[in-house]
Amino acid sequence: VFAVIDVIVGVLLGMKKAQNPGSMLDQSTSIMTMVVYGMPSWWLAMIFIMFFVYTIPLFPSGGMGSIPPPEGIASILDTIYHMILPIFTLFCITFWGRAYMTRNIVVGTLQEDFIMSARARGLQEKKVLYGHGLRAAAPPIVTMGVMSLLMSIQGRLIFEGIFNWPGMGNLYWIAVQQNDIPVLLGLLSTTTFVYLAGLAFLDVIYGFLDPRIKVGGKQ
């Protein structure tokens, strides 16, 4: 869930930044990217917990559900409620970098000759940006998005520990502490399979995103 929101918002913000490079939005968000990436991620997570749990008690400090657990539809809503703070924390840390990378990729693409030709034909700037620029810049952006999804499936050890979330990263750590070799092998095999499947998916989808790759393959 976090990875999907992160990729969508990051790409949209990056496209907006690329549309007006050097603008107030571009400069302010670029500075924010440097500030956030200069902070330890676990420290920012602890700050959010201190603020949203103890100063303004809006969310629980961690865990996947309340004790005792509710029943029925209330159980689903309770799980979503416990997911809000971890997802919000990860989102605030990672989507800035996603937007910055998208911005740099698209800005480079907008300098190409075919973009200037599209503008010379009188196409609307939005169509030039999303219809031509984004399509040409799609392969690296899609790669970035798929790798983000794969990393989210693998788990994030530090955040799962801070928020006491029972994910794959936390399971890795418990298996290492207990020297549980079968669990470690199972997790490693699952992670390897997921990554290989993701890379195979990227190879297939590249042919649809960039016709030059498809033609080169046929030759």
Language-model regions, residue ranges each:
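Peri-membrane helix termini and adjoining interfacial loops of integral membrane proteins
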Residues: 54-68, 160-166
